[in-house]
Amino acid sequence: MIIKPKIRGFICTTTHPVGCEANVQEQITFTKNKGKIANGPKKVLVVGSSSGYGLSSRIAAAFGCDAATIGVFFEKPGTETKPGTAGWYNSAAFDKFAKAEGLYSKSINCDAFSHEAKQKVIELIKQDLGEIDMVVYSLASPVRRLPDSGEVIRSALKPIGETYTATAVDTNKDCIIEATVEPATEQEIADTVTVMGGQDWELWIKALSEAGVLANNCKTVAYSYIGTELTWPIYWHGALGKAKMDLDRAAKALNDQLSATGGSANVAVLKSVVTQASSAIPVMPLYIAMVFKKMRQEGLHEGCMEQIYRMFSERLYRTDGAKPETDSDNRLRLDDWELRDDIQQHCRDLWPQVTTENLSELTDYREYKAEFIKLFGFGIEGIDYDADVNPYVEFDVIELQ
């Protein structure tokens, strides 16, 4: 079939398998060009490995460190008449390229919050790898089914305490609007912590540890975003921030546990990037369009892959073997360039000046839109979007019901 982009709200409901493969290829090429990470991990589990930072982590491990990787994700395959999710095609492409280089690659399509997912991964590790020396936790799910009760909990992207009103961009109509978001209830805050906090990360490490499949020097990392006062009301000081603070709590507990055998647990605070997750957060698209333009001008721009390669090579797996630089809360800070005073001051000054008319001139809004559509495999140079493609893409994936 011929597949064209169809956008509804802040998601694109169609995806292009060839475009998604090209995205993965581009990240692999970047990683290979940067060179091998000398003392990188060799057996890596990535929970949430199909897009964004999780996918880049799997690529950095495999193509930057020659690691065997197991990827866990929850995606929909395509059929003969309907495209699957971008994450399905990304994972299929990763698997194809990894196997072509003789790298071990196993993928599990399942609910990562479930007990079954953890048991299946443990079984695979025991059978094929013996143990793992890195666990990347990169889930971005709006809902979580509690593994014991089966209850479904939903998160809320809301401020705390008071209604939040700010200048934002309507990405469907490409115009500047006033966005208003009502505050979260106490229950919504608690639910957001349950879905997006550190509980499931702890459950993964507990299950892997009790099964005896964590190597002595195993490192684990989970991803977070803090931002600045421009986005704090909706993010760090909102319900989502409470969940990310719970991730910090979990990191401390896990680090105490893993450091006893030479391992470590850290939260890595990353920069804002265009992902399906960030596009859903009010004001983030406008902020990203602003900050990207300034960072590009300063030669500091990074996408997911650049960030993760830097985290591996300059933080967790340094050539001198030294411990990574961390902040006072033991976090790895990869948002250091974004948070530079000159970059943030530029955004603060610009925010009140942006109108629908000058949006594309003052910010990188056009580039934001292009990067957004690229997530789904569209708008990529060299791909013939009028050509017939098969949306049904098979690969070596274990399906758990």
UniProtKB/Swiss-Prot annotation:
It is an enzyme of class 1 (oxidoreductase). The active site is at 235 (proton donor). It holds the Pfam family Eno-Rase_NADH_b. GO terms for molecular function: enoyl-[acyl-carrier-protein] reductase (NADH) activity; NAD binding; trans-2-enoyl-CoA reductase (NADH) activity. It catalyses: a 2,3-saturated acyl-[ACP] + NAD(+) = a (2E)-enoyl-[ACP] + NADH + H(+). One of its GO terms (biological process) is fatty acid biosynthetic process. Substrate binds at residue 225. PANTHER family: ENOYL-[ACYL-CARRIER-PROTEIN] REDUCTASE [NADH]. Involved in the final reduction of the elongation cycle of fatty acid synthesis (FAS II). Catalyzes the reduction of a carbon-carbon double bond in an enoyl moiety that is covalently linked to an acyl carrier protein (ACP). Belongs to the TER reductase family. Monomer. NCBIfam families: EnoyACPredFabV, PRK13656.1. This is Enoyl-[acyl-carrier-protein] reductase [NADH]. It comes from Shewanella sp. (strain W3-18-1). The gene is fabV.
